[in-house]
Amino acid sequence: MRLSRGICIALALAAPFTLAAAPALAAESRPACDRDCLGGFVDRVLQAMMDHAPAHAPLAPDVRHTENGAALKPGEGFWSTATAIAMAGDGLSTLGRNSSAYRLYFADVASGQAAYFGAVTDKGAPGMMMLRLRVIAGKVSEIETVVVLQEATGQGGADGLPDLDPRGFDEPEATLLAGGERWSPTIMAAAAGRYLDSMTTGSSAGVPLGADCVRRDNGIRTTGVPDAKRPDPANPASRSYALGCAAQLDSGFFRGIVRVRWRPLVVDQERGLVMAAAMVDQGTRPEPPKKTARGRRAQAPEPVPTEFTALLGLIIKMSDGKITRVEVIERPAAKDMALGWPG
């Protein structure tokens, strides 16, 4: 079913007010920190990471900081080893020949949250970082990052994850949408959730996927690849990058995934972008229960134990109510590891 657009209702103020009071009301209606303001906080935190100096960022005394689901003090983890971060105004030369200048900024003004998705290097190793901030009263109270480095991903495919190539990312269109083209944050988050949940159901039913949807994993295009081999009907375990986003879900491409634990991070309504994080648990899924002589299905099998967990950071682009782009960074995680945040 096609998602219906929310109806905008104009409310008229019944009580008259003087012209002198109007500027004060207008000032009160403006957010304490708008899109540009939130972007400034992102840049200050990124610069503090580059400086290896948390004191250079406007952090709240009780700021909470996680990296790849683990709680760390500001200054620990990537913060202490970063050698380059693609920021506004940077060129390719700042990250080295084997990286890129890809960077994308997000803002959810209503919730006081900002985010970043871009290329980084850690002691010379190319990588990508997804970052979320929450700003309260002019201070950063939450910092959540997913950092994926080339050396920590697929190891040539040994663990089923593609090797990271930061040069392969293609930035989604990030221009501001006109008011009539925007969808409610609730609808956008729900659409992202349906896509993630469908990785366990093996069905694209109910997922608002556009016909031109493209997915990339660690910079590698994994849908709609023109010269990729088609799935082998004689081999149910075969997987193909030739299929589109919907057909890929329906083909059983993700059949090894038994559980997806996800949470939306930032919904940028003005740009049609959703940032999410997920822990994806994989195992050996048994054959579905067969029908008995009376036509009833046998008892459902026990829950499938996790054999491998991957941490995913996702950027989902929506246009006209459809998902048109899915950019994923992923790395191995401890088995059954939590995301590190509630919700």
Stretch-by-stretch model annotation:
Residues M1-S4:
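N-terminal secretory signal peptides that target proteins for export/translocation
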Residues L25-G343:
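C-terminal and inter-domain tail/linker signature
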